[in-house]
Structures are given as structure tokens and as C-alpha cells.
Amino acid sequence: MKIVEGNLSVDKSKKVAIINARFNHFITDRLVEGAKDAYARHGGNPEELDLILVPGAFEIPFALDKALASGKYDAVCCLGAVIRGATPHFDYVSAEATKGVANVTLKYGKPATFGVLTVDSIEQAIERAGTKAGNKGAEAMAGLIELINLYGSLEK
């Protein structure tokens, strides 16, 4: 059986962007740093990444659609943090951001990863932004690098 999978080596011929939600920036800024670090650890130059800032996680799919439609980007790492509060707002934002990113990815046939934290507390967000539970921004970028290479293998 032939196994087809991506690897964790940056394809320097591909243009990559990060879309980051500014809401909860004390968390999302750490996710961006993790993503940049992962890109560097796997052979890329973080200075070659474009950072697209949006107000919140709900706006990520719109920016992703515009970025991929432009033809400028081969892949996008989407980052943000939605923290549960006392109202159902969390449920609406997290669900629509998730569905939106998935739909846009399928629409353009280009890889995007979903590094948007959906957590119950600030403590959980902090843990996932570089303390106890690693950095989910770094994980999202590593996944994106692997997907870029997998897509390349599947297109041949």
C-alpha cells in the first residue's frame, strides 16, 4: 500500500499568510508568535509571512475568502480566541468561524488551518497559548506546512 502524506519542511515556493483576530489580543498575539516560531523551526523565514488582522474570529472567514480569491496566497493559518461568557454569543461566533473557514477552504481548494481557540475560560486560553498545553498557533502552522506538502503530493 502506498502512503501519501505531507512533511514538515516549508515549501519556500508557496506564499503563506496568517489571519489573526485582534479580539483577545493578549492571547492571539501569543498564537501568532507560536505560528511564526513553527514556520522558522521548519525551514521558513517568518519575515516572508503576511499577517492579516481582523477584528474578531467571526471575521476570519471573510478575510480568508478575500485572501484566497486574490491568488496571492497558497495557504493560510487562521488564529483567534473565543472565550465563553455568560451569553450564547460564544456558540454563534465559534460555530460560524469554524464553518466559514471550512467552507472557504473547500471553495478554493487551498489549505487553511483553524487555530482558533474555543475555550471556557481565560485560564484555558492561556494554557493553549504557550504554557501547559503548548501553543496552538504553532500547532496550526505545523499542520499547515504538512497540508501544503500533502496537497502538492496529491496534485501530482
Curated annotation (Swiss-Prot):
It comes from the Bacteria. 5-amino-6-(D-ribitylamino)uracil binds at F23, A57, F58, E59, A81, V82, I83, F114. The keyword Heme does not apply. Its EC number is 2.5.1.78. It catalyses: (2S)-2-hydroxy-3-oxobutyl phosphate + 5-amino-6-(D-ribitylamino)uracil = 6,7-dimethyl-8-(1-D-ribityl)lumazine + phosphate + 2 H2O + H(+). GO terms for molecular function: 6,7-dimethyl-8-ribityllumazine synthase activity. Pfam families: DMRL_synthase. InterPro entries: LS (IPR034964), LS/RS (IPR002180), LS/RS_sf (IPR036467). (2S)-2-hydroxy-3-oxobutyl phosphate binds at A86, T87, R128. Pathway: Cofactor biosynthesis; riboflavin biosynthesis; riboflavin from 2-hydroxy-3-oxobutyl phosphate and 5-amino-6-(D-ribitylamino)uracil: step 1/2. The keyword Transmembrane does not apply. One of its GO terms (biological process) is riboflavin biosynthetic process. Keywords: Riboflavin biosynthesis, Transferase. The active site is at H89 (proton donor). It is an enzyme of class 2 (transferase). GO terms for cellular component: cytosol; riboflavin synthase complex. CDD domains: Lumazine_synthase-I (cd09209). Catalyzes the formation of 6,7-dimethyl-8-ribityllumazine by condensation of 5-amino-6-(D-ribitylamino)uracil with 3,4-dihydroxy-2-butanone 4-phosphate. This is the penultimate step in the biosynthesis of riboflavin. Belongs to the DMRL synthase family. HAMAP family: Lumazine_synth. This is 6,7-dimethyl-8-ribityllumazine synthase.
